[in-house]
Structure formats: structure tokens, C-alpha cells
């Protein structure tokens, strides 16, 4: 017997049960899609692209470059993970890169002036902190209501928290001469993304 609360009709391809069930549990799906697009733009346009430039300018610090590369590639992995979820929910990406960039939930991590190591590490740290806040918000609104999005967001959040710890360690050492251990090492493989990654993207 069909559930009386059922909205999607037999054979109907204009609606999605995957949306129906989370809407019934209180998820504002249009708002969630908007938030996911903002986070996708932040992961790809605000961080992955600009982290490429920041990494290049960490001149003379190969160890710092490796950590930045891990964060850069993992942000790309996050982008790859978010996009399918946007479409599953019935959303879509803007068909214009500038329009997409302008929706980013975090400020673009543009090369600072002057591009000193301390300024770059500070920018990297604050970018990761913005990501943590953004993903925590999505975890909050999907917990107990949308397990698919919550699982994805919590996996990404785990890695963003690790990234923050990395850049705290590096910045404290470089700027303040202090030891504030992150509690873990760089990845075994660049961009390994142990919590979120679904395929390899390393392209040196």
C-alpha cells in the first residue's frame, strides 16, 4: 500500500523521492542547494584555483608546498564530491564561471601583497576556517534529516579541520617560533583525502 504522504507518483521523472523524503523531515531543499553551490564554488574557485598560485609562491619551503598541495588537491576532491549531490537534489551549477565564482561562500584566497610566507600561511589558515564554518552549518541543518548530505559534509569537514591544524602548526612555527603540533603528518600520497576522496586526482 502506498504511503498517503507520498508525493512522487508512479513513473514520474519530474520529481525525486530522494528530495521528497528529506523535505518531509524538515530540510529546506532550495536553501540546501544554494548552500551546496556556495560551498562548491568556495572549494573550486576560491581555494583550489587560488591555492595553486599560493603553492607556487611558497618559494624555498618545499615542506610547506607539500602541505599546501595536499589541501589544494583535497579541496578539488571536495568539489568532485559536492557536484553530484547538487544535481541529485534537483539543482545545477551556473553555466557561467564568473557567476559561479561570485556565489562562493568564502572569500577568494588571492595571492597577498606582499606574498611573504607568513602572509600566505595566514591566508591559507583563514580560508580553512571559513570552510569549517560553512560545512558545520550544512552538518547542522542535515543531521538526522538528510543522511546522504550529512555524511558527505561531515567527511569534508573532517579534512577541513585537519587542514586548519596543519596551517596553525606551520604559521606558529614560521611567524612566532612556536611549536603547536597538528597531531598528524602530511598525506602519504598528495591529496589523499582519507575521509572524502572517491578517486585519484594527483597531477604534478
Model region roles, listed by residue range:
Residues 1-204:
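Iron-associated oxidoreductase/ferritin-like identity signal
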Amino acid at each position: 500500500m502506498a504511503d498517503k504522504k507520498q508525493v512522487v507518483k508512479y513513473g514520474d521523472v519530474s520529481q525525486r523521492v530522494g528530495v521528497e523524503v528529506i523535505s518531509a523531515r524538515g530540510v529546506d531543499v532550495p536553501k540546501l542547494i544554494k548552500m551546496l553551490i556556495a560551498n562548491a564554488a568556495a572549494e573550486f574557485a576560491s581555494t583550489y584555483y587560488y591555492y595553486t598560485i599560493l603553492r607556487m609562491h611558497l618559494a624555498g619551503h618545499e615542506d610547506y608546498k607539500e602541505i599546501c598541495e595536499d589541501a589544494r588537491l583535497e579541496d578539488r576532491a571536495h568539489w568532485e564530491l559536492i557536484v553530484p549531490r547538487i544535481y541529485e537534489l534537483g539543482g545545477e551549477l551556473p553555466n557561467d564561471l564568473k557567476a559561479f565564482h561570485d556565489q562562493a561562500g568564502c572569500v577568494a584566497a588571492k595571492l597577498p601583497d606582499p606574498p611573504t610566507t607568513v602572509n600566505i600561511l595566514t591566508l591559507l589558515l583563514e580560508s580553512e576556517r571559513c570552510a569549517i564554518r560553512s560545512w558545520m552549518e550544512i552538518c547542522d541543518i542535515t543531521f538526522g534529516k538528510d543522511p546522504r548530505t550529512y555524511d558527505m559534509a561531515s567527511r569534508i569537514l573532517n579534512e577541513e579541520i585537519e587542514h586548519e591544524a596543519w596551517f596553525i602548526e606551520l604559521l606558529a612555527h614560521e611567524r612566532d617560533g612556536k611549536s603547536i603540533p597538528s597531531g598528524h603528518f602530511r598525506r602519504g600520497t598528495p591529496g589523499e583525502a582519507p575521509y572524502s576522496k572517491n578517486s585519484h586526482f594527483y597531477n604534478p
